[in-house]
Regions:
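Thiamine diphosphate
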Residues: 1-114, 119
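Glycine-/acidic-rich phosphate or pyrophosphate-binding loops and their flanking alpha/beta elements
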Residues: 73-76, 81-84, 94-168, 173-175
Length: 177
């Protein structure tokens, strides 16, 4: 265990070096909002085909105790659009476990796991299908009138919305992406 302090770029660059040396599987963690500082090193691990794992915490659309300066708004789009980076934003413990296993097996590209600090409901319907990038979590009713797409901590919220809509006889399909 290496304590890097407040040095996100150095942390990610050192993990690249550990990966390049071989024999170890490096992973590191920081708040998702601070991923701006480690982005150049993540890009290099993608270019060098290094399987470093980046755990990015405190992901949420909600304002937490640290205030709006700690809301990762544009960061998900940044990593999703970076070539050769596997980006995971799991909605519960099962999807997190599948993402972690996939990241451990993926030794050719960096993996980023965006994890929330919020308490999440474990949904019975979640599955390894999340590794495809998106899947139908549940159909609420038979002939759905709309599709609701959500990812990460917002899937639980979308699930509750679908239940409420079904009470109003509006059938929906929920996709976890």
């Amino acid at each position: 265990n290496i304590h890097f302090g407040v040095r996100e770029h150095a942390m990610a660059a050192i993990c690249n070096g550990i990966s390049l040396h071989g024999g170890l599987l490096p992973y590191c963690a920081t708040f998702f909002v601070f991923s701006d500082y480690l982005k150049p090193a993540v890009r290099l691990s993608a270019l060098m085909n290094q399987g470093v794992i980046y755990v990015l915490t405190h992901d949420s659309i909600g304002v937490g105790e640290d205030g709006p300066t700690h809301e990762p708004i544009e960061h998900l789009a940044m990593f999703r659009s970076t070539p050769n980076v596997s980006m995971y934003r799991p909605c519960d413990a099962k999807e997190t476990a599948y993402a972690w296993i996939s990241a451990l097996k993926n030794r050719k590209t960096p993996s980023c796991l965006a994890l929330t600090r919020q308490k999440l409901t474990n949904l019975e319907e979640t599955s390894a299908e999340s590794l495809k990038g998106g899947y139908v979590l549940k159909d609420f009713g038979k002939d759905f009138e709309m599709i609701i797409i959500a990812s990460g901590s917002e899937v639980g919220l979308a699930y509750k919305v679908c239940e409420k809509l079904l009470e109003e006889n509006i059938c929906t399909r929920l996709v976890s992406m």
